[in-house]
């Protein structure tokens, strides 16, 4: 298997559709082979799924909002805004998310959502600074968006330059934040999954800090490199 990085994607917004499909087709049980690690807000995913399996008529929005309020505490309002932004970004871009190939796993995150999402998460971290548990949960969710930004760092940077947008990201800052989030989570789990998490952390933190460049073919030697 390749290194599995979690999505910056709140999957619980689609759980009710899945449960309804099961009910409509008389499915009364199913088996989940692998949770693929504790992905972005997987605790909330499990909470919403469990309650809907017990009673499919429950209001999905109330379940999600109640879970977000309890899970993120003082940062709940900002985290709800962030999670809804990620949901809306995927729906807006109408892009299929693939399981393999790390670049394609983050193809639904665009520059605008990366910038706005980071601004919202800055506010969430500030709101949670007096609550250690909530702050660490914000950090753990944020590392999903940070992974997307690191994977597409130079692509986004070039786009920002072309569109005249201020470039707000610093690669070292993001790498340090990712490393801290993984270390906090390993402390919380008592080291469970250490090898996998360290592999993901090392992979992200080893991404090149300069863009990979190639020689321009002689046929294009009179072209501006920025246009190629």
Write out the residue ranges for each language-model feature.
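Catalytic domains of carbohydrate-active enzymes that cleave complex glycans
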Residues: 25, 52-228
């Amino acid at each position: 298997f390749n290194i599995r990085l979690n999505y910056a994607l709140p999957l619980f917004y689609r759980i009710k559709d899945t449960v309804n499909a099961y009910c409509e087709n008389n499915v009364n049980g199913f088996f989940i082979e692998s949770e693929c690690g504790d992905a972005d807000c997987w605790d909330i995913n499990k909470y919403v799924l469990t309650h809907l399996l017990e009673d499919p008529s429950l209001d999905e929005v109330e379940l999600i909002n109640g879970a977000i309020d309890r899970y993120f505490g003082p940062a709940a309002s900002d985290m709800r805004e962030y999670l809804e932004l990620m949901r809306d970004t995927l729906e807006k871009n109408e892009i299929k998310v693939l399981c393999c190939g790390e670049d394609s796993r983050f193809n639904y995150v665009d520059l605008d959502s990366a910038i706005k999402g980071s601004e919202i998460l800055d506010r969430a971290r500030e709101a949670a600074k007096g609550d250690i548990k909530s702050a660490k949960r914000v950090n753990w969710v944020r590392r999903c968006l940070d992974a997307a930004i690191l994977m597409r760092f130079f692509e986004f940077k070039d786009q920002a330059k072309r569109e005249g947008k201020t470039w707000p990201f610093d690669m070292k800052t993001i790498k340090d934040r990712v490393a801290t989030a993984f270390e906090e989570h390993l402390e919380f789990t008592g080291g469970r999954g250490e090898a996998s998490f360290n592999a993901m952390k090392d992979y992200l933190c080893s991404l090149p800090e300069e863009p990979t460049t190639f020689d321009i073919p002689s046929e294009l030697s009179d072209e501006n490199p920025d246009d190629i």
